[in-house]
Amino acid sequence: NHIIAWFGRLALAMGPLAALLVYGFWGYCYIPVFSGVLALASFVLIAMVRFPFKAPSEKMPLFSLDRFFLPQGLPLFVNLILIMMVVGVLLAQVHSVTYYAMLLSGLAMAIVAERFAFVNAELKSEVLTGIIVLAAAVLMEFTHQARALNYMQPAMIGFASGITGSRFLLFYLKLSKHCQRGTSQSSFFLAWETGISLGFLLKFGFLSSDSSRVPYACLGLLVISLGLYNFFVHPWYMKHRNR
């Protein structure tokens, strides 16, 4: 579960980076072709995986959230959406190849930090650190310094989203009951992607006319996320976890 989720996070930087490189070498018309080839390759790889057949339960409801959404993880779901909305808003702005390369380096730093810095740290330290680092990345918008916005900001976004996403996934897995690991992982990905999508919607739907409002909106979301996590979600999780 952990490894698959990390490949998804790395794709957050590698996808736009690849698109910009294709655009730079061959133009926009080749981007849909390149995307189609990647989708076809993904389909082939998934088709190569053999899943053992398992008989369904005796009572199969017509509608079921099984393998899709974990109802008892709703507080985690809402909190993660709010955090990832900030990432979505920041990524919705115009960026360069350098930006996404630094975003990838930030994700790599998060992997190293998980292995060494947070291995024996307090349980909620990763999420709190991630929110604080993400807030610092947002504050860089006020500097209007191109070097900081092209190098430091994306690295901090990658680092923050990496350590925050890892901890939320582990929370989901430890909150799940027997045979619910697949469901908890699907819920995590749904919250992750929904948050980024809503961030894009917020940027293009409500903040496109005045980009100066972007940092204020992001900081507002982060303040809500920090308060929600520290005073409600984490204590709630400690009472309801199964592992």
Task: Locate predicted features.
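Interfacial helix-cap and linker-helix signal at transmembrane-aqueous boundaries
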Residues: 18-26, 117-118, 202-211
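Intracellular juxtamembrane helix-capping segments at the cytosolic ends
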Residues: 1, 162-177
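Glycine-rich segments within core transmembrane alpha-helices of 12-TM secondary carriers
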Residues: 1-20, 189-200
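A late C-terminal transmembrane helix in Major Facilitator Superfamily
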Residues: 175-212
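C-terminal transmembrane helical hairpin of 12-TM major facilitator-type secondary transporters
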Residues: 122-168
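Flexible interhelical linker loops that connect adjacent transmembrane helices
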Residues: 42-77
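Symmetry-related core transmembrane helices of the 12-TM Major Facilitator Superfamily/SLC fold
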Residues: 29-48, 213-235
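Transmembrane alpha-helices of Major Facilitator/SLC transporters
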Residues: 99-134, 192
